[in-house]
A protein has these predicted regions:
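Active-site gating loops and adjacent loop-to-helix segments of metal-dependent hydrolytic enzymes
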Residues: 59-94, 197-200, 227, 276-283
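His/Asp/Glu-enriched, well-ordered alpha-helical/loop segment
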Residues: 201-202, 245-325
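Active-site loop-helix segments enriched in His/Asp/Glu that coordinate
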Residues: 83-154, 159-171
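Divalent metal-coordination and catalytic microenvironments
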Residues: 9-10, 24, 29, 42, ...
């Protein structure tokens, strides 16, 4: 057993993200105690982010000209898929590795990736993860005539949408993944409503986007215990629209946040928080929850990460309260959501 370590400062504590002055005690990577006491206000200690939707594979083609959604990402002929198919595996693996390092540096402790390319695609991402310490991942593969083997090597299945393949093929995939008892997720309602009902009929664990969703769709998500993941920066960039995050939350559904395609957006969750806080919500506590605990719930990791509590893993980011950027912040949580940047981070704990 490693010796107990301690860290003191202003702590964003628990599932309600209460701002507490005190000391955390950590043993073998697990938070074992919190002692509330007045300590130096030099650092803010917060839970790391959970990025609930990424496409790490397209790290190899960052910032292409913005055309339209189908031309960029729709299989099989969208720009992304053409590039993935012709790029050597070693180049893809190196590009994904750079993105994963950037994730860690910017405060993300876990992510859910929709990984194209079948078994080879999943194995490539796993190879990129080898030297990434305790960065947690849920890799949802996309079948490429290799469904049985893919279910063995992936953590589940993530599909592009119900309109992108024949119904009988789709049903075969969904049946197999449900028998495997692994998670199944799908994009829906990104640019219009035509695929929303059919996606819900498949009973996925979560749906990505629902940008075109209505209150009845959000209620159906809640009723079916289907989580929602929004990608607002990506939606705005591609012209898909703006998700009704308030409506989703009002329905009671669990809503997580993802940065979506690396070709279009960095995996920096600080940017996503600022964007959501500015455009959609003025509730800083709720915004932070979307990007941390709710992402952990979507990934079924909320018993381990997503908030700072006894018994959970100590996946923490420590921010410099005295940085040029954070000097003068009076509300620590609001400063974290609206103002903080990756360069304010002094240390990332737990994902070394």
């Amino acid at each position: 057993m490693k010796p107990t370590t301690e860290i003191s400062g202003t702590i964003i504590w628990g599932e309600e993200f209460e701002v507490i002055s005190g000391t955390l005690y950590i043993e073998d990577g697990i938070i074992v105690d919190l002692i509330e006491k007045q300590v130096s206000d030099d650092v803010i200690i917060a839970p790391c982010f959970v990025n609930a939707h990424t496409h790490i594979g397209d790290s190899v083609i960052k910032d292409p000209p913005i055309t339209n959604l189908d031309e960029l990402v729709r299989p099989p002929d969208g720009l992304k898929h053409r590039m993935l198919n012709k790029t050597p595996a070693v180049e893809l693996i190196n590009a994904m590795g750079s993105t994963l390092k950037d994730m860690k540096k910017t405060g993300t402790t876990a992510f859910i990736d929709f990984r194209e390319g079948g078994v080879e695609g999943v194995n490539g991402l796993r190879q990129s993860l080898i030297d990434m310490g305790n960065l947690r991942s849920i890799i949802l593969g996309r079948p490429h005539n290799d469904l049985p083997e893919l279910l063995n090597v992936s953590d589940g299945i993530g599909l592009s949408g119900v309109n992108d393949m024949p119904l009988d093929v789709l049903q075969e995939i969904v049946s197999a993944v449900k028998k495997s008892e692994k998670p199944f997720a799908i994009h829906a309602g990104e640019k219009d409503k035509t695929d929303i009902d059919a996606a819900f009929d498949l009973e996925p664990d979560f749906i990505v986007h629902l940008t075109s969703g209505s209150s009845s769709d959000f209620k159906r998500a809640f009723d079916q215990d289907c989580n929602i993941v929004v990608c607002p920066r990506s939606n705005l960039l591609t012209g898909a629209g703006m998700p009704d995050i308030k409506g989703m939350l009002t329905s009671g559904a669990v809503v997580g946040v993802g940065t979506d395609n690396v070709m279009l957006n960095s995996t920096n969750m600080f940017d996503e928080m600022k964007f959501i806080s500015t455009i959609f919500l003025q509730d800083d506590r709720q915004v932070f929850k979307l990007c941390t605990l709710n992402g952990a719930k979507v990934s079924n990791m909320d018993n381990e990460i997503g908030s700072i509590e006894t018994g959970k893993m100590a996946h923490l980011m420590v921010l410099n309260r005295n940085s040029y950027n954070l000097q003068g912040v009076r509300n620590h949580l609001s400063g974290l959501v609206r103002r903080a940047r990756p360069d304010d981070i002094i240390q990332i704990i737990g994902v070394e």
